């Protein structure tokens, strides 16, 4: 890709207590034509000389106290959205400790221009990686797949690409620590924003001793964010079953049982999950595919309820079966990737 094109791409580097190699990383990125935004996340004063080496080559953001990677990323997105709209069309976030190869950063920059969605650089986690990194990665990958129905081999990677038009959306996503990056993926999944993966090198220098990731504290924070999403899902499912049971208990005609219960299920899943759990932002326009898949799930589940009704079978059991089918369909739609199409 030519330098002129990369000049329209910003590399956002959140930095806390940088390594002496940091200026070399900045120089290499600059030589490739990137716009560089550095956010000093409250580093200790003794690291100021390292920042002094790069200040004339970058847009530099700083504040007094360490507030976390998520906060630093959002400050960077805010700065780009407010000041660089004419200069930047796309943004690549990368770690400042050398974990991301410069060539991989450039490859993400190329791909995000083709997809115009989110690009996630994914490491090969089957390789030998430090234990404290594997703990968070494996747990996050498993829980994310169970809850969203989408398998991402590496959802903890900090190497990502975004269209600059998403800066306001990115600033509104909750989280100031490491959980922020996972919240971005969960919210993108719920709102139908496509996520494309690209293989990148797995680099852990000095057994990842320079990382500021705290295995227990940060893993709990990250998984808590995921589980909150799962709890909301469970609430909607429980509400659906309770609605069916109450209607059946009061002997309301079965026509109302399956129509009302299906309304609760599908509308709840497509409205409550998205508005209640993520209703903190100026929302993006949701894909038409999102509504089409909702209608398909509604029709299939309603047919199941009709079958149980006409056969005289226990209607609450039919509700469980319909719920199971809806969950499976949601999983299949998520794995197919069609939810991200506009």
Label every PLM stretch briefly.
Residues 17, 41-45, 67, 76:
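Conserved short acidic donor-positioning loop in nucleotide-sugar-dependent glycosyltransferases
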């Amino acid at each position: 890709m030519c330098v002129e094109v990369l000049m329209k791409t910003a590399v956002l580097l959140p930095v806390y207590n940088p390594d002496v190699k940091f200026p070399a990383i900045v120089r290499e990125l600059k030589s490739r034509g990137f716009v560089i935004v550095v956010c000093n996340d409250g580093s200790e004063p003794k690291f100021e000389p390292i920042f002094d080496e790069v200040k004339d080559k970058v847009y530099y953001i700083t504040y007094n106290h360490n507030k976390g990677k998520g906060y630093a990323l959002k400050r960077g997105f805010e700065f780009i959205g407010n000041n660089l709209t004419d200069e930047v069309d796309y943004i690549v976030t990368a770690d400042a400790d050398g974990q991301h190869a410069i060539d991989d950063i450039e490859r993400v920059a190329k791909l995000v221009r083709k997809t115009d969605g989110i690009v996630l650089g994914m490491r090969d986690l089957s390789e030998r990686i430090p234990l404290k990194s594997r703990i968070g990665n494996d747990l996050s990958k498993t829980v994310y797949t169970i809850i969203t129905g989408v398998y991402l081999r590496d959802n903890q990677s900090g190497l990502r690409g975004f269209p600059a038009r998403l800066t306001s959306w990115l600033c509104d996503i909750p989280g100031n620590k490491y959980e922020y990056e996972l919240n971005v993926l969960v919210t993108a999944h719920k709102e139908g924003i496509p996520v494309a993966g690209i293989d990148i090198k797995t680099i852990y220098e000095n057994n990842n001793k320079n990382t500021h990731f705290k295995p227990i504290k940060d893993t709990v924070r990250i998984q808590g964010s995921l589980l909150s999403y799962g709890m909301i899902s469970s609430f909607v499912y429980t509400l659906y079953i309770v609605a069916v049971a109450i209607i059946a208990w009061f002997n309301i005609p079965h026509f109302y049982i399956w129509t009302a219960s299906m309304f609760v299920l599908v509308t709840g899943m497509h409205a409550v999950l998205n508005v209640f759990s993520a209703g903190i932002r100026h929302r993006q326009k949701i894909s038409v595919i999102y509504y089409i898949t909702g209608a398909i799930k509604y029709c299939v589940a309603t047919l199941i309820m009709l079958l149980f009704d006409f056969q005289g079978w226990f209607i609450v059991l039919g509700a469980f079966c319909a719920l199971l089918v809806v969950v499976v369909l949601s999983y299949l739609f998520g794995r197919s990737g069609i939810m991200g199409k506009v």
